[in-house]
Amino acid sequence: ESALERRSSSVVMNNVMKKPDLSDPKLRAKLAKGMGRNYYGEPAWPNDLLYMFPVCILGTFAAIVGLAVMQPTPTGEPANPFATPLEILPEWYFFPTFNLLRVIPNKLLGVLSMAAVPAGLITVPFIENVNKFQNPFRRPVATSVFLLGTVVAIWLGIGATLPIDKAISLGFW
């Protein structure tokens, strides 16, 4: 390790570990406006880790327990092992893929269309050659693919709950 590397690492560490200068008038003006917490170098330990995180965790836990007590999950009718239901639906997050397989008549084409989704998503970064840390709204291809995919997934998900003849049109036409 050279002397320059040691000096630059010590400068970085001094800037990171530097205590705030409370006699600085600019800092005092910001503190007076209420911009003090963690803005001027207040350490995360013990303030945030011992006080704020447990409050947030317990608040989230209390909200979940409260919602579970006030609105319990209803249980459906008991399953009859001797009768198959007319329409078997998957869990809600499988509705778009279920509907895609259901409406495409050729099963191989249905499976290939499902495989085309991740393959298409993999190609998006190569199509759009911009800085990956740029604002997402300045990445038109990725934003368009995301919005179109969301609309199609919602459309197919709603269609999965309808009969097969209305699965694509949703009964609009």
UniProtKB/Swiss-Prot annotation:
UniProt keyword Thylakoid present: yes
Predominant cellular place of this UniProt entry's protein: plastid
Transit peptide endpoints, chain numbering: 1-14
GO MF annotation list: electron transporter, transferring electrons within the cyclic electron transport pathway of photosynthesis activity; ubiquinol-cytochrome-c reductase activity
Subcellular location per the Swiss-Prot or TrEMBL entry: Plastid, Chloroplast thylakoid membrane
Keyword NADP in record: no
Cellular component aspect of the GO annotation: chloroplast thylakoid membrane; cytochrome b6f complex; mitochondrion
Transmembrane segments annotated in the record for this chain: 49-69, 108-128, 144-164
Bilayer disposition of the protein: Multi-pass membrane protein
GO process terms (BP): mitochondrial electron transport, ubiquinol to cytochrome c; photosynthetic electron transport chain
Keywords, sorted A to Z: Chloroplast, Electron transport, Membrane, Photosynthesis, Plastid, Thylakoid, Transit peptide, Transmembrane, Transmembrane helix, Transport
Other comments on record: This polypeptide is nuclear encoded in Euglena gracilis, but is chloroplast encoded in other plant species.
HAMAP family, per the entry: Cytb6_f_subIV
Function according to Swiss-Prot or TrEMBL: Component of the cytochrome b6-f complex, which mediates electron transfer between photosystem II (PSII) and photosystem I (PSI), cyclic electron flow around PSI, and state transitions.
Subunit-level organization: The 4 large subunits of the cytochrome b6-f complex are cytochrome b6, subunit IV (17 kDa polypeptide, petD), cytochrome f and the Rieske protein, while the 4 small subunits are petG, petL, petM and petN. The complex functions as a dimer.
Family recorded in the similarity comment: Belongs to the cytochrome b family. PetD subfamily.
Protein name per the record: Cytochrome b6-f complex subunit 4, chloroplastic
Source organism (scientific name): Euglena gracilis
Gene: petD
